[in-house]
Curated annotation (Swiss-Prot):
Native source organism of the sequence: Actinobacillus succinogenes (strain ATCC 55618 / DSM 22257 / CCUG 43843 / 130Z)
Xref: SUPFAM superfamilies: PurM C-terminal domain-like (SSF56042), PurM N-terminal domain-like (SSF55326)
Pfam families found in the cross-reference section: AIRS (PF00586), AIRS_C (PF02769)
Name this protein carries in UniProt: Phosphoribosylformylglycinamidine cyclo-ligase
Catalytic activity: 2-formamido-N(1)-(5-O-phospho-beta-D-ribosyl)acetamidine + ATP = 5-amino-1-(5-phospho-beta-D-ribosyl)imidazole + ADP + phosphate + H(+)
UniProt xrefs under NCBIfam families: purM
Chief localization: cytoplasm
Length: 345
């Protein structure tokens, strides 16, 4: 009796589905190309030249995911914007150091490849790359039977950017008297989602049908993370930006001190902006303390920038002309013994 001849597909890996996905995403990937990219998809490695305008180029790299926002997106079958979140989390971390994103790669892992879902995700990744002028040069699609529950997948992103060595933003220029400007977020972005999901569970609501300020709750908690690359790079070019903090995990308390010298503090006026309805709803439904809100969520502020007070009005004009909602939210002061580096009052 002859044994059955087994194939990779019998083991749960469909190479043809993977090939179909590659064909489906090619038009989206093509939208992201930059002149520095050499070759196309399909090589063992992606090739990218450095832009000629840089005299002393320094490469800046970053990697990130979207946390358990992905769980919410999968449960609500909203796959077309989670890729924007993935790109945003990486490129926003690069631009706060003054870097222009050059290229991006993604990792998509699942138990059984659903080509339609994966194509939607990559379409979002490509859109995020377009928004940040970053080339999507490659990625890995891993179909791994037995590793994930049916319908589940995971994402990771990797980005490389470049900055002129003399223009690296490291916070060393921040000084007492600097103004603090906030850039509005689009919602919780991609942080705090384990708490978001817990609040939804405790509240006993269906985010797809629950209405908040005239919109479904699902739409507000899954709003894609704002990408600030183009507006911030323009601001850096036209003003003397001293530092930028990307408000991600750890919120205000942990991210702002990352860009401050040890001898100063950020004093923030919380009446200078309004929390979006989704943050008020989360605080109320979860009975979350003010301190915990500022530690877990961005509370409506995606980035905080420090620059000379004399340039504050000019900076606000530039940012608003670029389509950003921006406010003056505070100032840098000298740090006294025993004080925290972030004071919100």
């Amino acid at each position: 009796m002859s044994k059955q001849s087994l194939s990779y597909k019998d083991a749960g890996v469909d190479i043809n589905a993977g090939n179909e996905l590659v064909e489906r995403i090619k038009p989206h990937v093509k939208r992201t190309t930059r002149s520095e990219v050499i070759g196309g998809l399909g090589g063992f490695g992606a090739l990218c030249a450095l832009p000629a305008k840089y005299k002393e180029p320094v490469l800046v790299s970053g990697t990130d995911g979207v946390g358990t926002k992905l769980r919410l997106a999968i449960d609500l079958k909203k796959h077309d914007t989670i890729g924007i979140d993935l790109v945003a989390m990486c490129v926003n971390d690069l631009v706060v150091q003054g870097a222009e994103p050059l290229f991006f790669l993604d990792y998509y892992a699942t138990g059984k490849l659903d080509v339609d879902v994966a194509a939607d995700v990559v379409k979002g990744i490509a859109e995020g790359c377009v928004q940040s002028s970053c080339a999507l040069v490659g990625g890995e699609t891993a179909e791994m039977p037995g590793m994930y529950r049916e319908g589940d997948y995971d994402l990771a992103g990797f980005c490389v950017g470049v900055v002129e060595k003399s223009k690296i933003l490291d916070g060393s220029k921040v000084q007492a008297g600097d103004a603090l400007i906030a850039l509005a977020s689009s919602g919780p972005h991609s942080n705090g989602y384990s708490l978001v999901r817990k609040v939804i569970e405790v509240a006993g609501v269906n985010p797809a049908t629950e209405q908040l300020a005239g919109k479904p709750l699902a739409e507000q908690v899954l709003a894609p993370t704002k990408i600030y690359v183009k507006s911030v790079l323009e601001l850096i070019e036209k003003t003397d930006v001293h530092a930028i903090a990307h408000l991600t995990g750890g919120g205000f308390w942990e991210n702002i001190p990352r860009v401050l010298p040890e001898n100063v503090k950020a004093v923030i006026d919380e009446t200078s902006w309004d929390w979006q309805p989704v943050f008020k709803w989360l605080q109320e439904q979860g009975n979350i303390t003010r301190h915990e809100m500022y530690r877990t969520f961005n509370c409506g502020v995606g980035m905080v920038l420090a620059l000379p007070q004399a340039e504050a009005d000019k900076a606000l004009d530039i940012l608003r002309a670029a389509g950003e909602n921006a406010w003056l939210i505070g100032r840098i002061e000298a740090l006294n013994a025993g004080e925290q580096q972030v004071i919100i009052r």
